[in-house]
Amino acid sequence: MIIPVRCFSCGRVIASDYGRYLRRINEIRSEGREPTAEEIEKIFDDLGVERYCCRRMIISHVDLINEIMPFS
């Protein structure tokens, strides 16, 4: 659905980092390739997302809001 505002485990605000993360991932994908694990790690380091629980929240999020909207 929509990215949670805070990490479920530690309570850190992650919603503001999600948009910047997506932008950087989409820049890599616009080059016609998928991001490597090292590139994803560097993106998180640049954003200041250090804890693995916060990284998990961002990486595992699936944005389904556009698929659900037609049914409301």
Swiss-Prot record:
Its EC number is 2.7.7.6. InterPro entries: RNA_pol_su_RPB10, RNA_pol_suN_Zn-BS, RPABC5/Rpb10. It catalyses: RNA(n) + a ribonucleoside 5'-triphosphate = RNA(n+1) + diphosphate. Its cofactor is Zn(2+). Gene3D superfamilies: Homeodomain-like. It holds the Pfam family RNA_pol_N. Zn(2+) binds at residues 7, 10, 53-54. Part of the RNA polymerase complex. This is DNA-directed RNA polymerase subunit Rpo10. The lineage of its organism: Archaea, Methanobacteriati, Thermoplasmatota, Thermoplasmata, Thermoplasmatales.
